[in-house]
């Protein structure tokens, strides 16, 4: 048995060892790394502005939001307005200390303004004071109501689910 080996001689770089990456860098790859490091620290500004009073929030939003005095026994409210890219949304949050009880939103248009993207086991459309309201929840209780009335969209979400008639009563007091 006769074996023959042939090889060509060239000035080639030695291959990287399998457990070590090749150490070749170009100016473009260094620039890309620098840009990535810079953009990792960039943050989008918060589009929400908090207001000390409802009157200040109404002035900023350009429209009023009528709400119940209390929801689930909670009357402490905070007022916020989102203003971004020509869109405006007025939000009132009911909270007891750090614990949020409910959130009401109103914005011009007919889109869902709830910001709630959860999947609910039950969705039903009901009449609440002459307005068609979509209610979402589970086990016969509701956590989210969304509706339109006139030129505005509304959303009411509650932390602790409530009965459909209780949600309808709250919705009928929101304008």
Predicted segments — roles?
Residues 9-11:
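Bacterial signal peptide processing site
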Residues 150-175:
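Surface-exposed amphipathic alpha-helical segments
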Residues 38-142, 149:
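Short, solvent-exposed recognition patches
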